[in-house]
Amino acid sequence: MSQQNQTEYLDFELPIAELEAKIESLRSVTDQDSKIDLDDEIKRLQKKTAELTKKTFADLDAWQVSRMARHPNRPYTLDYISRIFTEFEELAGDRAFADDKAIVGGLARLDGRPVMVIGHQKGRSVKEKVLRNFGMPAPEGYRKALRLMQMAERFRLPIITFIDTPGAYPGVGAEERGQSEAIARNLREMSTLTVPVICTVIGEGGSGGALAIGVGDKVNMLQYSTYSVISPEGCASILWKSAEKASTAAEVMGLTASRLKELELIDNIVTEPLGGAHRQYDEMAQALKQRILSDLEDLDILDKETLLDRRYQRLMNYGYV
């Protein structure tokens, strides 16, 4: 793995974890005594691990994909920003109430080209999770995002967004400060921006909280990300009065990238490294960068009127199959 976080495993990954633990154990033996040659056994186990990983991830069901989208080691927005962009300068505050740490954004360069990048940001440690409010923005977060988008429009900069949220924060304070209005305003204003907008779901795409920075000319999803109006647990609690039916709900909700591509609600699926994005941050970031560059190339040739018409039609088509 290319990051420093200790790997965590989901239950369906445990057989893979056991093999990887054996490999590490053998390596520690050879490190302690160079006279012991275990290279052949290590190579055999590595081959077996690769085969098992490929088999496991070849046919994940919707519930397993949902859990992959929330994987604690999964790369977040700032992980991608540091690998895809240069000269990132974070901008803070909505100029009305506060700076919401659940949304990050600022100016950056993409292969030398100035852009505006915005995304949801979750935390890893308990302290950071609280600081980022578990990736659930309040109204001031969406107003900050809109402020940055309007700035990008003034300076004719493409806008790139990364979506990864369980949803907008549902607290009383957020509602009092106009959560629904902030989301609705973003939907309206994003549909009229006259610069290219590229959106990518990198983890969870939770309802209006995701859509509030997701109205774009190109909408992509990582292979093991999800996009839905409600979480599987929430859907199960409503329909079956039990969150234990979450796996059933996930199957019928059509929240996976492959299903949404079939419904023509997204443009592209970005393939993840074997075992998921959390196993190879750098490789995943490079694949996503190439997708963004390709999308920008496609959008650069379109005039403002075409951009606006296509984006508006996409928004109006949501909800129709």
Swiss-Prot record:
Chief site of localization: cytoplasm
EC category: transferase
Catalytic activity: N(6)-carboxybiotinyl-L-lysyl-[protein] + acetyl-CoA = N(6)-biotinyl-L-lysyl-[protein] + malonyl-CoA
Gene Ontology molecular function: any one: carboxyl- or carbamoyltransferase activity
InterPro entries given in the database record: Acetyl_CoA_COase_a_su, ClpP/crotonase-like_dom_sf, COA_CT_C
GO biological process: fatty acid biosynthetic process; malonyl-CoA biosynthetic process
Pfam families: ACCA
Domain of life: Bacteria
Assigned EC number: 2.1.3.15
Cellular component GO terms, alphabetical: acetyl-CoA carboxylase complex
Domain CoA carboxyltransferase C-terminal as annotated: residue spans: 37-298
Keywords for this protein: ATP-binding, Cytoplasm, Fatty acid biosynthesis, Fatty acid metabolism, Lipid biosynthesis, Lipid metabolism, Nucleotide-binding, Transferase
Subunit structure, as described in the record: Acetyl-CoA carboxylase is a heterohexamer composed of biotin carboxyl carrier protein (AccB), biotin carboxylase (AccC) and two subunits each of ACCase subunit alpha (AccA) and ACCase subunit beta (AccD).
Family designation: Belongs to the AccA family.
HAMAP family per the UniProt record, alphabetical: AcetylCoA_CT_alpha (MF_00823)
Functional description taken from the UniProt entry: Component of the acetyl coenzyme A carboxylase (ACC) complex. First, biotin carboxylase catalyzes the carboxylation of biotin on its carrier protein (BCCP) and then the CO(2) group is transferred by the carboxyltransferase to acetyl-CoA to form malonyl-CoA.
Protein name: Acetyl-coenzyme A carboxylase carboxyl transferase subunit alpha
Gene name for this UniProt entry: accA
